[in-house]
Amino acid sequence: MDQTRTPYFDVLLDYVDSGVIPFHTPGHMQGRGMDRSLRDFLGDNVLAIDLTQIRGLDDLLQPEEAIEEAQQLAAEAYGADNSFFLINGSTSGNQIMMMAALNPGEKIALPRNSHKSAMGGLIMSGVAPVWMKPEVDVGLHMDHTVTPQTVRATLDEHPDVRAVYVVSPTYYGATADLEGIAAVVHERDLPLLVDEAWGPHFRFHPALPIDAIAAGADLSINSTHKMLGSLSQTAMLHHKGERIRVDRLKSVVKLFLSTSPNLVLVASLDVARKQMATEGAALLSRTIELANDTRRRLNEIPGIYCFGDDQVGRPGVFDLDPTKITITVKALGYTGYEAEEILRRRYNVQCELADLFNCLALFTIGTTQDSADRLVYGVKELSREDRPIDVFSPSGVLERRLQTGTYNLPAIPPMRMKPREAFLADTELVRFKGSAGRICAEVITPYPPGIPVISPGEEITPEIVDYLELEKKAGVRMQGPYDSELRSIRVVREPHGGIWIPQT
């Protein structure tokens, strides 16, 4: 196929050029009915192609014309049998993969550091999780990936598992031995589902880790908006092989798409594919070179450590995406949260995420030399500062953790109910500090990085209470709970009842 083509973007442009008078949605009528402040900011061109799925513009839920051709071009570019454009991000992609691969009540093996959208998939699908423990680097305070050995041991212990789901790469860029995992999974004729949200660029440069489809995944999800040139919310789902029924997959995809999709988002996927298929290698060569040079410069700053190839080969780090730069600041006496805040407030540099010890900087095809220089300057100035540990955090309780240089992550709690059962059960609010021993009925996710610490159906342990209390004191935002301050938590109601109402 001709990868220089952008069939869907082209039909939108043709519609605009035709001068059609619209009497259809959206109501702003190509910007004419929009408030001028927003119209002037967005520009007429964007608003002109914010159209609806009328005749000639195809239908994302039932593509037969330009969208179908655009998806076929994407499948060829990614080495897949089928590719699907998504406008609800990899969140919907993760949930689609589970519902397409399994039936309610069946079991799926997945790592504990799966994104919270995977928990949403478990709740919606009625699938039961068998948790796998990823490899952990306690010194860096981060989870990596699961190994083929862990997958094999899990399947040996749970022979009734019907699919395996893995995360590769992680937020920090560590990738799994996907070929090894695929061999383990496929020898039992099970499907392998891969959350490759952070790896949409892997396919297009030999210096990057192998992509999931090439490694043997049956389904994989890519957040093209995270690392490539498409707009926010956009992602692609890729399918290869015969273990997943294509008719069922297409039916599930439709459940997660709007009947009024933003066609600007769809067009951005079409154009981003063309850009990577035709220019990706050159663009990524520059990005990788810039990232590696910046990593080297950062490592020359006293008290700063940015891991790279030195981590490859360690447990859970089969390979590494060089475009992710993890800036470890614990030797400076700062938390990652504080460092992120200082970089933003004082040096106008915004990192992707922070955790207890680290800040993460993403380098993409849009990162410039000037931007990299600003990052290096900000971190260099940060290293010269002499500030107390609680300069931006509400409490200095983290000082001992920083001095020891380690941080123990909580163990996976016992599962007492299936996630769907607990989520839909009769519930009550109880004081969080006194909730140990109760069955959780909601997802508690420190964000970023968006990995649930406890999920519906799991027993709240004292260790988890302590962990989340410390995260709260460090200023971490909690996503998922009814009480966003986590003074209370929703649990499955017990026969004796009783609702705790937090004081205002």
Placement of each model-derived feature along the sequence:
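N-terminal "arm"/small-domain region of PLP-dependent enzymes with the aminotransferase-like
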Residues: M1-E65, Y447-P449
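Conserved PLP-enzyme active-site core in the AAT-like
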Residues: Y8-F9, L13, D17-I21, D40-F41, ...
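Conserved N-terminal alpha-helix of the aminotransferase class I/II PLP-enzyme fold
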Residues: V46-S92
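Generic beta-strand/beta-sheet core signal
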Residues: P111, M132, V167, D195, ...
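A generic structural motif
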Residues: T170, Q275, A331-L332, I365-Q369
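Short acidic (Asp/Glu) and glycine-rich catalytic loops that position anionic groups and cofactors
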Residues: V246-K250, S268-A277, F318-T323, L353-C359, ...
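Conserved small-domain helix->loop->beta segment predominantly found in fold-type I
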Residues: A282-L360, T364, R387-A411
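PLP-dependent enzyme catalytic core of the Aspartate aminotransferase-like
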Residues: I342-R346, C351-T504
